[in-house]
Design a protein with these regions (language model features):
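Soluble catalytic regions of large protease machineries
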Residues: 1-174
Length: 174
């Protein structure tokens, strides 16, 4: 949606920094394979091949549903990390309903489609993710980490998951 469209490359690096920081802070970094700054929006965060794959007929419906719900939470948190980092860290302002409404609506749609979540359940998941991401990016240290990560990404252009995690660790995240 338009709220996640990038104004320029700097905006894009901060969005990617926000997603990466959120993945690591939420302990979901195992899903990340690579970061590509020059990729099209939506393709900058390369996830591991099994992320989003739920079609194994040997898995129980409960396991598949739980995996889908976990991935919805991870994706929601990443989208929120993207916009929160860009707003809090780069623009130095808070979120508005114009920032969050498109993400909330996407969570409702995806939650219904992939997890059979009712609107109130999808909204609760969204609010939990927003609360977590807000707490992460309220720390001034995280602002410094995000800015340094964005600068390094701009210089390198690509990073493996391991390089990104090591960089965040060296910057004090963990």
């Amino acid at each position: 949606d338009s709220v996640l469209r990038y104004a320029d490359e700097r905006d894009k690096t901060f969005g990617i920094a926000g997603m990466t920081i959120t993945l690591v802070a939420c302990r979901d970094e195992e899903f990340l394979a690579e970061i590509r700054l020059d990729a099209e929006p939506g393709e900058t965060m390369v996830m591991k091949h099994d992320y989003g794959m739920r079609a194994n007929p040997r898995m129980s419906a409960k396991i598949i549903w739980t995996q889908a719900l976990d991935e919805l939470r991870t994706t929601t948190s990443m989208a929120l990390g993207n916009i929160v980092c860009r707003r809090y860290v780069m623009a130095r302002r808070g979120l508005t309903p114009a920032d969050t409404t498109p993400i909330r609506e996407a969570v409702r749609s995806e939650g219904l489609t992939h997890c059979s979540l009712e609107q109130d359940e999808a909204d609760a998941l969204f609010e939990r993710c927003l609360s977590t991401v807000d707490r992460i990016f309220r720390h001034s240290t995280v602002h410094q980490v995000a800015a340094a990560f964005a600068d390094e990404l701009s210089a390198r252009r690509t990073m493996s998951a391991r390089e990104a995690i090591e960089l965040l660790s060296s910057l004090g995240l963990r």
